[in-house]
Amino acid sequence: MDFDALELLLQASLPVQLILAILIIASITSWVLIFEKYFTLTRSTDASHEIEDKFGEGEKIENLYLALKEKDLGDLEPSELILVSVYDSLMNKNNSINEVESTERLVRVIVNREEERLSKNLSLLATISSSAPYIGLLGTVIGIINAFQGLSTTAQLTLSSVAPGISEALVATAVGLLAAIPAPIAYNQFSKKLDNLINGSLAFAEQLIIQINKK
C-alpha cells in the first residue's frame, strides 16, 4: 500500500474505516482458506487416485491393505480409508448379504464423514463472496453521503469539498470487489473437486466390494 492510499485510509470517516477493516479481514481470511483448501483437496485427491489406480492396475488388495495399515488411520484419505475398512469388514468372512449391506452402510458413513471434513469452511467462502459486495456498497453509500455533506458545508462547489467522500466511496467499492471476486471462483472449483473426489471414492468402494466378494 503506497503512502497516498494509507493517507486516504487514515483520513476516511470512522464508519468507512470500519467497513474497510472488515473487508480487508474478509479478504485475508478468504485467501488463507483458498490456499488451505487447495492443498487439502489436492492431497486427498492425489492419494485417493493413487490407490484407485493401483487397484485398477491389478495390484493385490492384500498388498495395498498392508501398506495402508502401516499408516496412522487419521492420515488416510477417502479411498485409502475405504479400502482398509472394506477389507477389514469383508475379508476372511462368508460375505453374506447382511455383511455386504453392513459394509455398504459403513462406506456411506465414511464418505459422509470425509465429505464433512473436506468441506469444512467452504461455506465461509460462500458467505464472503455473497456479503463482501454489499459491505463494500455500504461503504460506497457512506462515502457519497460524506461527499454531499462536504457540499453542504461550503458555499462554492470545489473538487476539494467532494473529493474525500468520493474517494472513500471508490475505495470501499474496490476493496469490496477485491474481497468478493476470488471467493466464489474458489468455492465453485473446490465444490466441483470435492464432488468428483466423493463420487470417485463411492465408485471405488463398489468395485472393491465386488472384487472381494469374488474371492
Segments from the language model and where they lie:
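Hydrophobic membrane-targeting segments
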Residues: 1-53
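Residue-level signal for the membrane-embedded core of alpha-helical transmembrane segments
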Residues: 19-29, 132-135, 139-142, 177
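Physicochemical signature of membrane-embedded alpha-helices that form the seven-helix bundle of GPCRs
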Residues: 22, 125-128, 163
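Alpha-helical transmembrane segments of multi-pass membrane proteins
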Residues: 23-26, 184, 188
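Predominantly long cytosolic amphipathic alpha-helical stalk/bundle segments
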Residues: 46-158, 185-215
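Hydrophobic alpha-helical transmembrane segments of polytopic membrane proteins
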Residues: 169-185
